[in-house]
């Protein structure tokens, strides 16, 4: 029986997605370490992101951000700075192919998040065993339809999504092997904002519901993940790193192999 976060019972079919995101800093050697350590620590899936700077859209409101009093309505993320940042983090098609083979070597399932419909051919050709639809694409219905036609292991995140959009996405995926992830798109997410009661609520759409956890590791450890398991979560996703927390953008919300064990 698989152990995840020190819990054994009922985890035989448990899925743990080690989200490598951009924690490799564009260095494939670091990504190789991440795959090895995640696999050795109990992960069932290793996930990267198929994201390219060329797909980045210019949005004027992000240039300076939008504030209402002390509340952030739109974050400040200038286009050119974000373009340059993403460009340094891109993995080539050949590197994605190497990643898939590396995951297979370590007997974990290679997975990616698709951020643009035009990249689906590449993802299919590379041979990813599973695909994730990000929260902000839960309402990208044309892309979801194409994914439903082409992939057999689908995970869809539900942060920043209206309930009606979740229902429509699930209607499109009816008949597919898919799983929902409860997610709060806040980095980091406080435990008070985790809203784990959404996990049983989401089961009206599918019996397979998990948690994508973005809590602050130094403050909240893996408590949200453990609580989700006791609520019957069938999968967990966490950002994963082999570097110190201050060395990557998502480092503070990323666990290490020590946490996973």
Regions found by a protein language model. Name each.
Residues 1-261:
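Catalytic cores and adjacent flexible loops of soluble metabolic enzymes
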């Amino acid at each position: 029986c698989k152990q995840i976060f020190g819990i054994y019972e009922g985890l035989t079919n448990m899925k743990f997605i080690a989200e490598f995101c951009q924690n490799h800093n564009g260095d494939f050697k670091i990504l190789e370490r991440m795959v090895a350590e995640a696999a050795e620590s109990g992960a069932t899936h290793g996930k990267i992101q198929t994201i390219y700077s060329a797909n980045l859209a210019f949005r004027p409101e992000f240039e300076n951000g939008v504030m209402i009093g002390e509340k952030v309505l739109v974050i400040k993320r200038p286009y050119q700075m974000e373009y340059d940042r993403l460009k340094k983090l891109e993995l080539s098609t050949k590197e994605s192919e190497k990643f898939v083979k590396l995951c297979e070597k370590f007997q974990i399932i290679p997975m990616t998040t698709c951020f643009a419909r035009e990249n689906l051919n590449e993802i299919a050709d590379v041979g990813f065993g599973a695909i994730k639809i990000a929260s902000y694409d839960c309402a990208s219905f044309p892309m979801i339809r194409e994914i439903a036609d082409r992939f057999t292991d689908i995970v869809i995140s539900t942060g920043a999504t209206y309930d009606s959009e979740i229902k429509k996405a699930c209607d499109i995926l009816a008949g597919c092997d898919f799983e929902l992830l409860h997610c709060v798109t806040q980095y980091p997410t406080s435990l008070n904002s985790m809203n784990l009661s959404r996990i049983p609520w989401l089961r009206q759409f599918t019996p397979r519901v998990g948690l994508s956890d973005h809590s602050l590791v130094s403050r909240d450890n893996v408590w949200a993940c453990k609580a989700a398991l006791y609520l019957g979560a069938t999968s967990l996703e966490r950002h994963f790193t082999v570097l110190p927390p201050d060395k990557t953008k998502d480092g503070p919300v990323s666990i290490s192999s020590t946490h996973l064990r």
